[in-house]
Amino acid sequence: MSIMMLPMEQKIQWVPTSLQDITAVLGTEAYTEEDKSMVSHAQKSQHSCLSHSRWLRSPQVTGGSWDLRIRPSKDSSSFRQAQCLRKDPGANNHLESQGVRGTAGDADRELRGPSEKATAGQPRVTLLPTPHVSGLSQEFESHWPEIAERSPCVAGVIPVIYYSVLLGLGLPVSLLTAVALARLATRTRRPSYYYLLALTASDIIIQVVIVFAGFLLQGAVLARQVPQAVVRTANILEFAANHASVWIAILLTVDRYTALCHPLHHRAASSPGRTRRAIAAVLSAALLTGIPFYWWLDMWRDTDSPRTLDEVLKWAHCLTVYFIPCGVFLVTNSAIIHRLRRRGRSGLQPRVGKSTAILLGITTLFTLLWAPRVFVMLYHMYVAPVHRDWRVHLALDVANMVAMLHTAANFGLYCFVSKTFRATVRQVIHDAYLPCTLASQPEGMAAKPVMEPPGLPTGAEV
């Protein structure tokens, strides 16, 4: 610690040369290594600390407590003089001879603060937290920038109502779709119906595992108070169902592309047995690719910055479920549309089959409905986490609701495009309603068949 002798009209400057000098000014030498690091950090980011604390930005601390403003020139130099004079009496005598005694005395009184009578019954302010201090003051703590509360669920009960309606309407509709497609696949033995049946089965699994078990049971009923092993095992089934649904749609896309662009090869290669084997291979691959997501972290509970494993799993999910499938959809659908336009320019009628129209509708619907979820997931990973920003929390809730809508929207698309599907659905409903009607009629009132086998004449004997 050094004192520079200057003329009387200039100020005495004091330059700290080590952490010991700073702790000496603060009035104690018993600082731990953690406190030294805090002092060093405060020395580097003084402006940042002042900008984050309304308490330090106030003009003064009222109520008889210490004045903690950062004072330029006179007061701060006097404060430094007083501490130096206490350590060096010789320097004190020398300064008195130069006429600086009044300045040092004022600074010394400022260092000691108000008198005991003036400060009786008033709270004291600690400049830096020490190991013996229980915590920061309440006013300081309320403006501490590093502490952030968990973001509230702004949507409230709307997701619960939405998923309940989606499950109550979507699951019966999906079961009806599966029965109708099973009849069409058995009757026609066309590969496209087998692929649509497998796609519907995957949507049913998504509704049961994700919508019912995930959002409603774990989220709403149990409030996420579920054993971690159960949650992680459910993650495998959820991601496997998502992968199966998307990649079966890719099989349908490739089948339609081959049927339109390479019809001879499609007729020679397509068969019900080969179609079933392709579906079984995709389902097995989907289950295997869902196993790594056992370590998937819930974004509502993920309070730390994403680790390497988290980033790998989130990027794998985005690539497997959205980016790669959308790339395949874009290429194959563009080739199909280009083929149909060429037929129109050559004078032939560009006939668009029902399966092709259903394919274009399914892929377009999937691309639009899943885009918000993927965007919010990447935003959560690199910009703002869900648990800190209520807007990201709300965006993730809405994105999940929109993404789950595709599991029930396919039925309306099938009915809108295909007259054969509508007729099959009516037949399924009629067949299910007729036994219930016959069972509800009294005994002896059942309708007789229109055509009766011929019997023996009355009075005739065998």
Swiss-Prot record:
It is a multi-pass membrane protein. Keywords: Cell membrane, G-protein coupled receptor, Membrane, Receptor, Transducer, Transmembrane, Transmembrane helix. Residues 87-123 are annotated as: Disordered. InterPro entries: GPCR_Rhodpsn, GPCR_Rhodpsn_7TM, Orphan_GPCR1. The keyword Membrane applies. Its main location: membrane. Residues 174-195, 255-278, 338-357, 419-462 are cytoplasmic. Residues 106-115 have a biased composition (Basic and acidic residues). The chain crosses the membrane at residues 153-173, 196-216, 234-254, 279-299, 317-337, 358-378, 398-418. It comes from the Eukaryota. GO terms for biological process: G protein-coupled receptor signaling pathway. SUPFAM superfamilies: Family A G protein-coupled receptor-like. This is Probable G-protein coupled receptor 142.
